[in-house]
């Protein structure tokens, strides 16, 4: 059994993610982190789900049982926990969140002492300890070796200062009207405070979490309400965060939702203009539109592609000395300020670009047009390696020659083959998609 998925351990709270599993996972992680412990402290944060209380208490029990001292900071964005892990000199950080998922799901994400998400080898080592009864028993502490726990409520101030430090010192948001949808999630206090303190007139929606309404028809997954409110309040821009605030969706002053690849392109333009872009390159995933790549090339910026997931984006950034990257889904990483996607940092950089350029959101956020794209799923009986399917290599060569970009891969969670096609000719795309669906149905369904 594998515990870790693409972003930590995630599942339905009380079922897959039970109190028992959470406590044992905390013990296993604590045993692993203590091997290279420097301070014997771990910080734990959460979003606003009701199940967060259960999981938090289970994690604290598990960590203190193996001798760790725990700092509990309550509801905080995921990027805040990444920041605080390093800022508070902790051995590790743990965030309890299922990000954009519904309230009944929850998850546990780990950060190392530098605030980075764990590498696969770290996760495998924790899993091995989790399933090793003897190691768990041998590391259970007694007497004065049992750890302690304390709750600190004022660390939110440290994160707010950090966010404001990411905004240019010579600018203020005075006169700017901003609507923020906090998705009834972890940033319901932080996001409005930061924008207000920088001088903006802030209108906040979905900022009354009750444990069950996180991401409920609101936030980054449902930006429709934000679009209406931007028009209603005649705001200059709108920002929708998800439940743990590592993702951002942007709405311009006309109430139009801006595609993520355009946001990435606009921010790359800004960083290049300001001389802040390192290595003349950015990282995006295999899902980003080819038009982004072609546009960046006109600016002398290389687009490096990574696998899907912000931790893979960050890995590629580190490898190549790049300080900016993101996913079209809204996870955007400014390497100078954050080790993970940070929706609030991204929102601040967009407003800085507006102020620097003295232009409205709609004037800066559409630097190019996306190429037509089409995505379809084919249900499959088995996930045969694609390269072993007869005639597939020849078909791939033909697609490449046609000038159409294709991404064909199996879903990680379902018995489905996902087909993404992109190109300048919509009719050509549709014809090829029909051919591919038929091809794979005959061979895999």
Curated annotation (Swiss-Prot):
Stored Pfam families: PGM_PMM_I (PF02878), PGM_PMM_II (PF02879), PGM_PMM_III (PF02880), PGM_PMM_IV (PF00408)
EC number: 5.4.2.10
Keywords assigned: Isomerase, Magnesium, Metal-binding, Phosphoprotein
GO biological process annotation, one example: carbohydrate metabolic process
Cofactor note: Binds 1 Mg(2+) ion per subunit.
Binding positions (Mg(2+)): 99, 242, 244, 246
InterPro entries in alphabetical order: A-D-PHexomutase_a/b/a-I, A-D-PHexomutase_a/b/a-I/II/III, A-D-PHexomutase_a/b/a-II, A-D-PHexomutase_a/b/a-III, A-D-PHexomutase_C, A-D-PHexomutase_C_sf, A-D-PHexomutase_CS, Alpha-D-phosphohexomutase_SF
Reported cofactor(s): Mg(2+)
Catalytic residues (positions): 99 (phosphoserine intermediate)
Catalytic activity: alpha-D-glucosamine 1-phosphate = D-glucosamine 6-phosphate
UniProt xrefs under Gene3D superfamilies: Alpha-D-Glucose-1,6-Bisphosphate, subunit A, domain 3 (3.40.120.10), Alpha-D-phosphohexomutase, C-terminal domain (3.30.310.50)
Task performed by this protein: Catalyzes the conversion of glucosamine-6-phosphate to glucosamine-1-phosphate.
Full protein name: Phosphoglucosamine mutase
Annotated organism of origin: Nitratiruptor sp. (strain SB155-2)
Gene name of this polypeptide: glmM
């Amino acid at each position: 059994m594998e515990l870790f998925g693409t972003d930590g351990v995630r599942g339905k709270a009380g079922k897959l993610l039970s109190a028992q599993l959470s406590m044992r996972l905390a013990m296993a992680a604590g045993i692993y982190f203590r091997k290279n412990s420097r301070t014997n402290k771990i910080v734990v944060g959460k979003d606003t789900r009701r199940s967060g209380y259960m999981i938090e208490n289970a994690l604290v029990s598990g960590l203190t049982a193996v001798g760790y001292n725990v700092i509990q900071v309550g509801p905080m964005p995921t990027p805040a926990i990444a920041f605080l892990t390093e800022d508070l000199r902790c051995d590790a950080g743990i965030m309890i969140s299922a990000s954009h998922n519904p309230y009944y799901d929850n998850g546990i994400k780990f950060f190392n002492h530098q605030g980075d998400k764990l590498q696969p080898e770290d996760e495998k080592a924790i899993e091995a300890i989790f399933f090793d009864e003897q190691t768990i028993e041998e590391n259970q502490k007694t007497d004065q070796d049992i750890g302690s726990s304390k709750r600190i409520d004022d660390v939110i101030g440290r994160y707010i200062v950090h966010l404001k430090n990411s905004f240019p010192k010579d600018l203020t948001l005075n006169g700017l009207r901003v609507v923020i949808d906090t998705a009834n999630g972890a940033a319901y206090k932080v996001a409005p405070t930061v924008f207000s303190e920088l001088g903006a007139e802030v209108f906040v929606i979905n900022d009354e979490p009750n444990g069950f309404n996180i991401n409920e028809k609101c936030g980054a997954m449902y930006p429709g309400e934000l679009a209406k409110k931007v028009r209603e309040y005649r705001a200059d821009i709108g920002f929708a965060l998800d439940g743990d605030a590592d993702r951002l969706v942007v709405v311009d002053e006309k109430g139009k939702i801006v595609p993520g690849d355009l946001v990435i392109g606009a921010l790359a333009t800004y960083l290049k203009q300001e001389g802040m872009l390192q290595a003349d390159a950015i990282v995006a995933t295999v899902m980003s539109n080819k038009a982004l790549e072609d546009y960046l090339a006109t600016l002398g910026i290389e687009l490096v592609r990574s696998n899907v997931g912000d931790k893979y984006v960050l890995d590629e950034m580190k490898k190549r000395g790049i300080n900016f990257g993101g996913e079209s889904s809204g996870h955007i990483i400014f390497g100078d300020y954050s080790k993970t996607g940070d929706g609030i940092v991204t929102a601040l950089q967009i407003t800085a670009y507006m102020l620097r350029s003295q232009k409205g959101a709609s004037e800066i956020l559409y630097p190019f047009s996306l190429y037509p794209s089409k995505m379809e799923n084919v249900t499959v009986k088995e996930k045969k390696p694609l390269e072993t399917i007869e005639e597939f290599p020849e078909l791939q060569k033909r697609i490449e020659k046609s000038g159409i970009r294709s991404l064909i891969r199996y879903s990680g969670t379902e018995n489905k083959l996902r087909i993404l096609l992109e190109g300048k000719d919509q009719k050509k795309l549709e014809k090829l998609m029909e051919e591919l669906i038929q091809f794979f149905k005959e061979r895999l369904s």
